[in-house]
């Protein structure tokens, strides 16, 4: 870095120097002052600045090396979420993992275990803290089938386990109204029926909307996931009332049903 230094020099007149030998010196005007400016390099300052630059460069290299060694995954922060660069990925607190006898699934974290047993072979039941109509069950029964496909199509399979949907309690004469057939007070509509293969295992998935004449909850959405493994028929049934289905329960019912799998 360059700096400017200024010095004052007294300039003596030549005539004054020549007359110094005279016995009588004439009064001379004051010598004019000459301002001289010189540009000089300040070597120590430059070296100090160079040291600062070197330290900054070294710090940059260290930060870059730390970033490469941290192995931060871009997936740690989803779109619209705050990045969690220096911590572990955030876990999903909406569900709790559950491992049972030969099966596993994710259970909504705000659902509690229930001792109620609705179906033969039922080994697990959880329900919503605030509404028991929102619940899930796991049923395991022996079977001579080798694959879920041996039951026929997903619709045919459902007809063989229709007890899962509930039986109508009233059997009498009724008029045809409200979309129900004569003498019928309950109905079931298949909304979706699919087959899939996961890790070499065949699964059936059926989504059903059941309604009763009393209009309770406007009906129930019942999701059934089923498969066969080691001579056993595994069924996971998750459901929610129609009103709560559209108020947020759908996410948890679908999440639980789709997470079900066998070992």
UniProtKB/Swiss-Prot annotation:
Pfam families to which the protein is assigned, alphabetical: PsbP (PF01789)
Subcellular location: Plastid, Chloroplast thylakoid membrane
UniProt keyword annotation of Thylakoid present: yes
Keywords: Chloroplast, Membrane, Photosynthesis, Photosystem II, Plastid, Thylakoid, Transit peptide
GO cellular component terms, semicolon-separated: chloroplast thylakoid membrane; extrinsic component of membrane; photosystem II oxygen evolving complex
GO MF terms held by the record: calcium ion binding
Coiled-coil region(s): none
Biological process terms in GO annotation: photosynthesis
Transit peptide boundaries: 1-77
Keyword Membrane appears in the UniProt entry: yes
PANTHER family: OXYGEN-EVOLVING ENHANCER PROTEIN 2-1, CHLOROPLASTIC, PTHR31407
Role summary: May be involved in the regulation of photosystem II.
Similarity annotation: Belongs to the PsbP family.
Name by which UniProt lists this protein: Oxygen-evolving enhancer protein 2, chloroplastic
Native species: Cucumis sativus
Gene expressing this chain: PSBP
